[in-house]
């Protein structure tokens, strides 16, 4: 048997998994613009994807074609910068958040990165309402990083927006492991499990769960 997958002496399976995630995070470096956006996110208490999650977003965006991207949950622009890094030069990021201050800081982050206003569309409001106004099958990638309670609604709308071959990406899909705990049955866990069920049972989608951040559930549409 190949020994490369064997646990190191004295290392349990959970600690090995944690070490792998830590290594993945440490392997990604962020430039000064991302670091500044992340610092502003911390200052205002806005969530921000980890560097490894950001790198994965950039990769998936590039693989999807990266011309039209929709984001639910702008934050201070950290994830937006990562998404834009994988987009084509003429691609447009549509990002939605209910918090005006988050949108202001994201706009600042994009401007500091030299991203022209024609490349981004920042929309304030409840995502459930805004998403219904976006056109069917018009997006290469939809990234959901908002209140887990509303994940099922966002997944339904997000899949509708995807063109064939497009990718939906859901952050906080494992809630740091709580979603996989049979004893956990709070409202967030129930909602996240329902979102995962919707994706798993949609025959148009091919999904995979990636153990980065609070869990990344990604699926490509046939």
Swiss-Prot record:
In short, the EC number is 2.1.1.-
Q: Where, by residue number, does substrate bind?
A: 145
Cite the entry's keywords alphabetically.
Answer: Methyltransferase, S-adenosyl-L-methionine, Transferase
GO MF terms here are: O-methyltransferase activity; S-adenosylmethionine-dependent methyltransferase activity
Q: What InterPro entries does the database record attribute to this sequence?
A: Cation-dep_OMT, SAM-dependent_MTases_sf, SAM_O-MeTrfase
S-adenosyl-L-methionine found in the keyword field: yes
UniProt-listed Pfam families: Methyltransf_3 (PF01596)
Principal EC category: transferase
Gene3D superfamilies on file = Vaccinia Virus protein VP39
Any GO BP annotation? methylation
Per UniProt, where does S-adenosyl-L-methionine bind?
49, 71, 73-74, 79, 97-98, 147
Q: Which family does the similarity line name?
A: Belongs to the class I-like SAM-binding methyltransferase superfamily. Cation-dependent O-methyltransferase family.
Protein's recorded name: Putative O-methyltransferase MAV_1364
Q: Which organism is it from?
A: Mycobacterium avium (strain 104)
């Amino acid at each position: 048997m190949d020994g490369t997958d064997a646990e190191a002496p004295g290392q349990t399976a959970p600690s090995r998994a944690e070490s792998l995630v830590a290594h993945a995070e440490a392997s990604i470096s962020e430039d000064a613009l991302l670091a500044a956006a992340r610092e502003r996110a911390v200052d205002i208490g806005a969530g921000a994807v980890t560097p490894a999650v950001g790198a994965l977003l950039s990769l998936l965006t590039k693989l999807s074609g990266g011309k039209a991207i929709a984001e639910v949950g702008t934050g201070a622009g950290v994830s937006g910068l990562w998404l834009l890094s994988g987009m084509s030069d003429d691609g447009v990021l549509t990002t939605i958040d209910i918090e005006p201050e988050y949108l202001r800081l994201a706009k600042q982050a994009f401007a500091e990165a030299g991203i022209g206003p024609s490349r981004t569309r920042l929309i304030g409001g409840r995502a459930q309402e805004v998403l219904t106004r976006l056109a069917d099958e018009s997006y290469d990638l939809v990234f959901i990083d908002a209140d887990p309670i509303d994940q099922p609604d966002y997944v339904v709308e997000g899949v509708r927006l995807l063109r064939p071959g497009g990718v939906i990406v859901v952050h906080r899909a494992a809630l740091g492991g709580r979603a996989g705990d049979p004893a956990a049955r709070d409202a967030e866990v129930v909602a996240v499990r329902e979102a995962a069920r919707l994706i798993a049972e949609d025959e148009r989608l091919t999904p995979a769960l990636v153990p980065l951040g609070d869990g990344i559930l990604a699926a490509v549409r046939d």
